[in-house]
Each structure stands twice: as structure tokens, then as C-alpha cells.
């Protein structure tokens, strides 16, 4: 019994020891520095950005009353969401005649390009920041000794900064178009039955765009985070060291110049 218990204890300790060794090797102080702290914020806000946009869903609608009779009121409810291919979303328009009861209609517009680009960029930002944090915390010596890693990190950071600006602006414009296409007034304007005398149309459910608006805000927050992080990543590159070295050399040359001139003047005075 004692041998089996000891074997079980050693088996339980071995995974814990491996986890402890892994945690001990991490350089947690990197998270207190701007380079690591901003990476954590980028990781979080990337989740907020693609999560709020990719999970959005809303409803729009209208009311159609045939022959001005309350008993013939038809309620139209149209659900839509990411990726906002509205032209594929169907709804039934009631017809106020005896020949047919309804007609299949579609919403107008395809706004999937800016929405999918926004979500895709958020997912790539999530994975890159997670990989960068692993390198910062676990392989910090490799990051500081090998100058290629800071250069690659700087180039990628600049690229993500540009892409976040484009994605946030494009999705903001796309969201404005989505709002215009999903208004109840746009729905009634597209239905021919609402333009005749046989029916009276009114606005129905108005879509709530709060989550979509927040996604645009998260997009611009990501842009500012990546733009601000460019400086801190640049300080890790050899380009920043070269610039400081040149400035120090210029200061030394300027400091030596007047001293040499004063020494020459003193020598001339002594000869006289």
C-alpha cells in the first residue's frame, strides 16, 4: 500500500513540478513594462473587437394593414446579423389581393467585406499578440540578443497599426450603410404594397445597433494601442541604438572642437 501511495504522489507531483518550472522561467516583470503591458491590452481589445462585431444580430420590421381593417394587419420581422449579406435575407411581403397571399422579398446591400475584414484582423491580432507575449515572457533572452526579433516585431506592429485604421474606418462606413438598409422606413419603401391605396404601412421593430457601434469604437482603440506601441517596439530595435550613438558622437565632436581651438590659441600666445 505504501509503495502504491508513494508512486501516486510522485505522479501527482511531476505535472505540478513541470508547471512550476514553466512559471518560474517566465519573466513577469515584462508585463510591468510598456512593451508587455500594451501587448496585454492589445490582446484583450482584439477579443472585444472581433467578438462584438462577429456576434451581432438584430431585427427590423414593418406593419402592413390591408384595406384599413385592423383584422388584416400583418407583422413583418426580419432578422439579420454578421456577416451582413443583407441581399440574401428573405422576408414575406403580404399582398392585399385575392390572387396570392405573399411575395418573397430580400433586403438590399452586401456589407460583408468590411465586416469580415474587421473580424479577421481582430483574430490575427489576437494570435499575434498572444505569440508575442509568449516570446516576451518565456524567451526574453532570445528577443534581446537576436536583433531580428525586434525588427520583425516593429514591422508587424506598424503593419497592424495601418490595417486597424483602415479596418475601423471601413467598418464604420459599412455600419452606417447597414443602418440605412435596415431601417423600417427602408423596408416599407422597398415593398410595392406600401405604395398603393390597398394597404397602409407603418414602421415596426427598430434594430438596436449598440453592440455594432461599440465594435467600431473597439476598432479605433486598437488602432491607438498599436500606434502607441510602435515607439516602445522601436526602442528595442538596433535602429534606435544607432540613432543614439550618432547623437553621442556629434556631441563629443562638438565638445572637442572648442577645446582644440582654445589649446591652439594658448600655444600661439606662448610662442609670442
Swiss-Prot record:
Vesicular side of membrane: 55-116, 172-213
BP GO terms, sorted: heart development; intracellular calcium ion homeostasis; substantia nigra development; T-tubule organization
Cytoplasmic side: 1-33, 138-150, 235-272
First-listed, main subcellular location of the protein, grouped into a coarse class: membrane
Pfam families, A to Z: MARVEL
Family classification: Belongs to the synaptophysin/synaptobrevin family.
Name of the protein described by the UniProt record: Synaptophysin-like protein 2
Amino acid at each position: 500500500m505504501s509503495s502504491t501511495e508513494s508512486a501516486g504522489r510522485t505522479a501527482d507531483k511531476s505535472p505540478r513540478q513541470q508547471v512550476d518550472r514553466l512559471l518560474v522561467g517566465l519573466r513577469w516583470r515584462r508585463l510591468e513594462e510598456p512593451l508587455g503591458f500594451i501587448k496585454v491590452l492589445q490582446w484583450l481589445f482584439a477579443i472585444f473587437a472581433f467578438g462584438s462585431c462577429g456576434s451581432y444580430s438584430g431585427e427590423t420590421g414593418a406593419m402592413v394593414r390591408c384595406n384599413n381593417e385592423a383584422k388584416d394587419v400583418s407583422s413583418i420581422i426580419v432578422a439579420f446579423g454578421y456577416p451582413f449579406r443583407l441581399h440574401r435575407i428573405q422576408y414575406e411581403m403580404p399582398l392585399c389581393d385575392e390572387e396570392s397571399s405573399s411575395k418573397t422579398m430580400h433586403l438590399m446591400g452586401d456589407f460583408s467585406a468590411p465586416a469580415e475584414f474587421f473580424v479577421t484582423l481582430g483574430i490575427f491580432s489576437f494570435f499575434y499578440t498572444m505569440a508575442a507575449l509568449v516570446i516576451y515572457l518565456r524567451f526574453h533572452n532570445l528577443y534581446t540578443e537576436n536583433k531580428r526579433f525586434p525588427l520583425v516585431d516593429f514591422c508587424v506592429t506598424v503593419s497592424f497599426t495601418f490595417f486597424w485604421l483602415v479596418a475601423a474606418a471601413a467598418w464604420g462606413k459599412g455600419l452606417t450603410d447597414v443602418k440605412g438598409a435596415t431601417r423600417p422606413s427602408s423596408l416599407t419603401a422597398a415593398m410595392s404594397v406600401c405604395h398603393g391605396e390597398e394597404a397602409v404601412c407603418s414602421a415596426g421593430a427598430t434594430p438596436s445597433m449598440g453592440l455594432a457601434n461599440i465594435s467600431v469604437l473597439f476598432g479605433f482603440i486598437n488602432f491607438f494601442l498599436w500606434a502607441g506601441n510602435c515607439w516602445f517596439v522601436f526602442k528595442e530595435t538596433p535602429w534606435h541604438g544607432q540613432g543614439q550613438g550618432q547623437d553621442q558622437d556629434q556631441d563629443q565632436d562638438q565638445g572637442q572642437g572648442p577645446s582644440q581651438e582654445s589649446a591652439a590659441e594658448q600655444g600661439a600666445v606662448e610662442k609670442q
